[in-house]
Each structure stands twice: as C-alpha cells, then as structure tokens.
Amino acid sequence: SLVELGKMILQETGKNPVTYGAY
C-alpha cells in the first residue's frame, strides 16, 4: 500500500515528515 511505502520512505529519511504527508 502507499501508506506502507510512505512509512518505509519515512524510516529511511528519518527527517522528512512531509514525504509521509504526501501519502
């Protein structure tokens, strides 16, 4: 799902909550 993908990206960056907000 896009939400899980967003969480995965958020964990990798760790400094970009805006990325998670996009999902």
Curated annotation (Swiss-Prot):
A single GO CC term for this protein reads: extracellular region
Which cysteines form disulfides? none
Q: Which keywords describe this protein according to UniProt?
A: Blood coagulation cascade inhibiting toxin, Hemostasis impairing toxin, Myotoxin, Secreted, Toxin
State its location(s): Secreted
What is this protein's tissue specificity according to the annotation? Answer: Expressed by the venom gland.
- Location (main, coarse): secreted
Any one GO MF annotation of this record: toxin activity
Keyword Secreted among record annotations: yes
Q: Which family does it belong to?
A: Belongs to the phospholipase A2 family. Group II subfamily. K49 sub-subfamily.
Purpose: Snake venom phospholipase A2 homolog that lacks enzymatic activity. Induces acute muscle damage after intramuscular injection in mice and disrupts negatively charged liposomes but not positively charged ones. Also exerts a weak anticoagulant effect only at concentrations of 40 ug/ml or higher. A model of myotoxic mechanism has been proposed: an apo Lys49-PLA2 is activated by the entrance of a hydrophobic molecule (e.g. fatty acid) at the hydrophobic channel of the protein leading to a reorientation of a monomer.
Q: How does it assemble?
A: Homodimer; non-covalently linked (probable alternative/compact dimer conformation in solution).
**Name of this chain's protein:** Phospholipase A2 homolog 4
Q: Which organism is it from?
A: Bothrops asper (Terciopelo)
